[in-house]
Regions:
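Intrinsically disordered, low-complexity segments enriched in small/polar residues
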Residues: 1-73, 78-133
């Protein structure tokens, strides 16, 4: 573990004194949701981080910071649209690994559409991860 930490410290583009910062963004990608907003509510192990009612094209963005001396943040969100609900983890770190597949740009991007929830780390290649039930 010490060896891994020292090696990581020598990569300045990924480390600051405050830690490594990741962008988490959830976008309402509906094309025809009329007067029904997409409602999102998120929490972390530290408590409630809040929610929003998103109209078409609106987004909910926050940042997670990883550091060697603080607990690793994990977030869970509930999406509600009409009568459908989805719960998912937009940012989760498995012990000894990097967060999800957030990539070298450190972005966890989510696009919510009528048929489900899509993930990307570069805002161009989207992979469907969850379907509305």
């Amino acid at each position: 573990m010490v060896f891994m930490s020292i090696k990581y410290l020598h990569q300045p583009q990924h480390f600051t004194i405050q830690g490594i910062t990741y962008k988490i963004r959830v976008v309402n990608g509906f094309t025809n949701n009329s007067s029904l907003p997409l409602v999102i509510w998120c929490t972390s192990q530290d408590g409630d981080i809040g929610g929003r009612a998103l109209q078409e094209g609106d987004d909910y963005t926050w940042y997670a910071r990883l550091s060697f001396w603080a607990p690793t943040p994990a977030y869970s969100c509930t999406l509600k649209w009409d009568r459908a609900r989805i719960m998912f983890a937009p940012f989760k770190v498995l012990k000894g690994r990097t967060p999800r597949s957030c990539g070298t740009c450190r972005k966890c991007l989510w696009l919510v559409k009528e048929d489900g929830v899509y993930f990307s780390n570069d805002d161009s290649k989207w992979v469907k991860e969850i379907s509305w039930i």
